[in-house]
Amino acid sequence: MSTVFIDRKDIEIRVDGNSISFYAKGKKDGSLPLSPLKRVVIVGNVKIETSVLYKLVNHGITVLFLTGKLKYSGILNGPLHNNGLLRVKQYQKSLSGFSLKFAKELIKRKIVSQRDFLSEIREIKKALAMQADRAIEILNKAISNIEVTPISIDSLRGIEGAASSIYFITYSKIFPNSLKFVRRIKRPPKDPVNAMLSLCYTLLHYEIVREIQLIGLDPTIGFYHQFEYGRESLACDLVELFRVNVDRFVYELFKAKHLGNRDFMKDEESGGVYLKKTGRKKFYPLYEQWVQQQRTIWRGEVQGFARRILEEKDIISG
C-alpha cells in the first residue's frame, strides 16, 4: 500500500523506529512501516507528533490534509528537487509563445478525451445515442476551431468552457435520477455525484503536484492557467488531461453500487452534500486500487513535459 488514509478522530500518531504507530486511548492500535509509503492523507482532526511529520518528509512521503468534509486543507512535501535549471527554463517558457502552443495542445487533448468518453456513453446508454451524437458533433467543431483558427488563451478558455458544458449535459444522463445529478456544481457540491467528482479532482490535483515536485518543476508556474498567488497553476494545467479518467471512475463507483445515496449526508447550513464516514471507508480502498493503474500514466506525462521544458531527449536525474 503506497497511500494510507487516516480518518479517525480518536487516533494519535507516533514514530516507532521506521514505522508510524497508531494509538487509541493511550493503547497501541496498529502500525505501518514507512518503506512502502508515498502518501499519507489525514482527514479531520487527528493528533500527530511533530516528529512524525519530520519522519514522513525525510522519507519523501507527501502528507495531504483534508477537512472532515474532504475539502483541501494543506499539503506537506519535502524540499524541491535540486535541478534549479529546469525551473528557470520553465519560467522562461511561461513568458514565451510556448504557453499558447502548449495550451492549445492541452485543451485539444482534453476535448478529444471528452468526445471519446461520449462515444462510450453512446454505447452504454442506447437511449442517449442521439444526444451523444449531437454533443460529439459540437466537440468535433471545438477541436477543429482549436486546430485551424487563430486563437488566444482567453478565447481558448471560452471554447473549453462551452465544450465542458455540453459534455456534462450528456454525462449527467448516465446516472440514475435518484442521485439528482443534473450539472456540474462545485462549491458546495449539491448531490452525491458532484461530491465524488470534487473529491476525486482534489485528490488528482495533489497527486499531480507531487509528481511535478519530484521531477523538479515548479507547480505554481503554469501555461494555460496563468500564475495566481497561492495556486499550483501547472498542476491545474496537467490535471485537465485526466479529468475524464476521474469522470469514468466516479461513474463506475455508482454503476457498481459501491456508493449510493445512503453513503452521503447533507450539510444543512451550506446545502452541500458530502461523503459520510461509512462511505469514506468504502471509497478509500477503491480509490487506491484505481489510482495504482493511473499513477504511471500521470508520472509519464509529467516527465514528458519536463523533457519539453529542457528540450532534451532524456529525463533529468539526480
Curated annotation (Swiss-Prot):
NCBIfam families: cas1. Belongs to the CRISPR-associated endonuclease Cas1 family. Keywords: Antiviral defense, DNA-binding, Endonuclease, Hydrolase, Magnesium, Manganese, Metal-binding, Nuclease. Homodimer, forms a heterotetramer with a Cas2 homodimer. Pfam families: Cas_Cas1 (PF01867). CRISPR (clustered regularly interspaced short palindromic repeat), is an adaptive immune system that provides protection against mobile genetic elements (viruses, transposable elements and conjugative plasmids). CRISPR clusters contain spacers, sequences complementary to antecedent mobile elements, and target invading nucleic acids. CRISPR clusters are transcribed and processed into CRISPR RNA (crRNA). Acts as a dsDNA endonuclease. Involved in the integration of spacer DNA into the CRISPR cassette. The gene is cas1-1. One of its GO terms (molecular function) is metal ion binding. It is an enzyme of class 3 (hydrolase). GO terms for biological process: CRISPR-cas system; defense response to virus; maintenance of CRISPR repeat elements. Mn(2+) binds at E160, H225, E240. It comes from the Bacteria. Its cofactor is Mg(2+); Mn(2+). Its EC number is 3.1.-.-. The keyword Zinc does not apply. InterPro entries: Cas1, CRISPR-assoc_Cas1, CRISPR-assoc_Cas1_C, CRISPR-assoc_Cas1_N. This is CRISPR-associated endonuclease Cas1 1.
